[in-house]
């Protein structure tokens, strides 16, 4: 009798345990189906969008006080490796000052032109047909990235007796971060009065970087001999305001050529390229 009772007790314990294990296996199978299959089919991974560069520079050229040329950089974003449950309809790159969309049946590359310096926060979006996501939107938000756009200003004046002040508005045009530094390179050339002979005089000049209080933040005097050049190279870190770069010299001296190059640079906080 004792042996029989023991056998019944063991069977009683095994049956609930078997039921528990069976339930666990069923739940596990359901979770595998939900987490495995759907994720593979439905999610478009951010790294599937390829971009070789996330920083570029606007170049603005001035001659005798007027803008003559501006070159805006173009960055490309390739959605070729992206995947979704159904066919893509379009690809979009969108930000504060940019909004470019292409037909997915024609190309996978979105080219974006940047006309404002600073940090652009961009959304990379793909639209695919008849498969609303959990938000009830046919658009699948792929990723959000940051692009750094800097600016270079090239300034030239020829044969001038009254150099024009170069106004530098270095305040950031997009994003929350001001430029990290202004890099200035200025050259004054004193052309020979008679080519290959000379006969002119040396020129005394003064470079000044003037802030919005009309005070000189920095200055540099220089002497430019006949037929030669002199330069002033400096950096300035108070960037989120307007300055004037001035070259002055005494009246009655020989006409001079003036050239400035100013780079408005930002800290490298952009997203790392994927290609």
Question: How should each PLM-predicted stretch be described?
Answer:
Residues 130, 199-213, 236-275:
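C-terminal edge strands of extracellular/lumenal beta-sandwich accessory domains
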Residues 131-172, 217, 265-275:
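Non-catalytic extracellular/lumenal accessory regions of secreted precursors
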Residues 1-51, 120, 124-126:
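Secretory targeting signatures
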Residues 161-225:
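Acidic, Ser/Thr/Pro-rich low-complexity intrinsically disordered segments
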Residues 98-107:
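Short beta-strand segments within Ig-like beta-sandwich modules, predominantly Fibronectin type-III
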Residues 110-116:
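Residue-level recognition of secondary-structure-to-loop junctions
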Residues 72-86:
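Acidic, Ser/Thr
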């Amino acid at each position: 009798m004792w042996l029989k009772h023991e056998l019944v007790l063991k069977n009683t314990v095994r049956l609930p345990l078997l039921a528990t294990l069976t339930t666990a296996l069923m739940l596990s199978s359901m979770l595998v189906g939900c987490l495995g299959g759907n994720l593979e089919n439905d999610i478009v991974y951010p790294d599937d969008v390829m971009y070789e560069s996330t920083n570029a520079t606007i170049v603005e050229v001035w001659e005798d006080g007027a803008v003559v040329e501006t070159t805006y950089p173009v960055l490309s974003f390739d959605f070729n490796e992206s995947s979704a449950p159904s066919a893509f309809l379009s690809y979009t790159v969108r930000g504060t000052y940019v909004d470019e969309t292409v037909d997915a049946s024609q190309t996978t590359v979105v080219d974006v032109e940047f006309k404002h310096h600073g940090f652009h926060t961009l959304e990379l979006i793909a639209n695919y047909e008849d498969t609303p996501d959990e938000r009830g939107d046919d658009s699948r938000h792929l990723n959000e990235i940051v692009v750094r756009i800097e600016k270079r200003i090239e300034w030239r004046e020829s044969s001038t007796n009254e150099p024009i002040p170069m106004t530098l508005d270095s305040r950031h045009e997009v994003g929350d971060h001001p430029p990290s530094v202004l890099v200035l390179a200025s050259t004054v050339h004193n052309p020979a009065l008679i080519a290959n002979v000379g006969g002119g005089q040396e020129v005394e000049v003064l470079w000044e970087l003037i802030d919005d209080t009309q005070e000189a933040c920095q200055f540099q005097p220089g002497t430019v001999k006949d037929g030669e050049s002199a330069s002033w190279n400096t950096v300035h870190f108070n960037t989120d305001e307007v300055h004037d770069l001035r070259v002055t010299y005494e009246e009655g001296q020989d006409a001079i050529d003036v050239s400035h190059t100013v780079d408005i640079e930002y800290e490298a906080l952009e997203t790392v390229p994927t290609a």
